[in-house]
Amino acid sequence: MYLQARQGCIMRELSSRSVRPRRRKTLQIATLLLASAILRLHRATAAERVDTVPRIAIVSAYEPEWLALKSATSVTRTEVIADVTYIVGSLEGKDVVLFLSGVSEVNAAMTVQGAIDHFKITHVIFSGIAGGTNPGLSAGDVVVADRWSEYLESVFARKTEAGWSVPKWLGKTLGNYGMIFPYAVEIAHPGQSKPEKRFWFDVDPIMLETARSVADKVKLAACLKQDICGGARPRVVVGGAGVSGPAFVDNAEFRRWIYDTFKANSVDNESAPIAHVAYSNHIPFIAFRGLSDLAGSDAGENTENELERLASDNAATMARAFLRDLPARESSEDSSGKTTR
């Protein structure tokens, strides 16, 4: 408001015949600078919709994960907002917007919220790779978790002679890994004095049922590196838990703790925070994760780079089959512009 008022004062002064030419030139430059500042302020503060068509957000973390999806998309246009490139178009008969979140939790949460603010998002889908934690699964398998946790939201406990000492407010936990004691995230809601505590974010049941209905029909690519993958044919596994955190897990002992404690089939960096954002915005969410390895199990170097294309493409294959069968969702908007069920 101050900038706009100041611009008005300058314009009134410019209209005065008593202003000298040099002074007038200075005021003209000042007006242009103020107009530019007002425009930038408007763009920075207003999360304006750039598209009114209801769309499914399809998210991947980094370039290899979305190659197969991007090449299959019929692109209408691209939008660049806050340095994020959004590809607008259609895929498998559905209106979509594709984008890369960037790797890890903050990037994922930030970019997905940005998409929700600027597009009319009806569903959020993640397609990408993950490390396996279930020893019964193999590289190339696609896991579709029914719930997600930010498992490294935690207390690092104090070590005493009697053992680990944790704050009284922590309460009961699922199980610790040394000094690491996981606990629920807190979610603020308008009109509530206390935040909601939530450890698991459930996948939308309709989306999960759709995934189950197509899982057995999907033909995944086989792993050609038998020395790494073994002889198992890749398959889709629907159900079970998944966890996400800021750490790249390449430690077999820690991976075993993840599986024993959370019964998680996979570990990654983005799915749970995206599930968190989707939950807060009342938007259905699901993730398709192709396994690039059993975390920490490689005899030599980590095999993620060797198998990321297989894992990415298999996740994309499942995501496309899912999109074809996903029923349309009626959506409305509340007064804030957020999509609601």
Language-model-detected regions and their locations in the chain:
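N-terminal secretory signal peptides that target proteins for export/translocation
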Residues: 1-22
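Alpha-helix N-cap/loop-to-helix initiation residues
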Residues: 10, 65-66, 105, 267
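N-terminal export leaders
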Residues: 22-28, 42
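Sec-dependent N-terminal signal peptides
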Residues: 29-34
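C-terminal segment of classical bacterial N-terminal signal peptides
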Residues: 36-44
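Glycine-rich phosphate- or other oxyanion-binding loops that anchor nucleotides, phosphorylated ligands
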Residues: 48-56, 80-341
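Mature N-terminal segment immediately following signal peptide/propeptide cleavage
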Residues: 57-63, 69
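Short Gly/aromatic-enriched secondary-structure transition segments
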Residues: 72-76
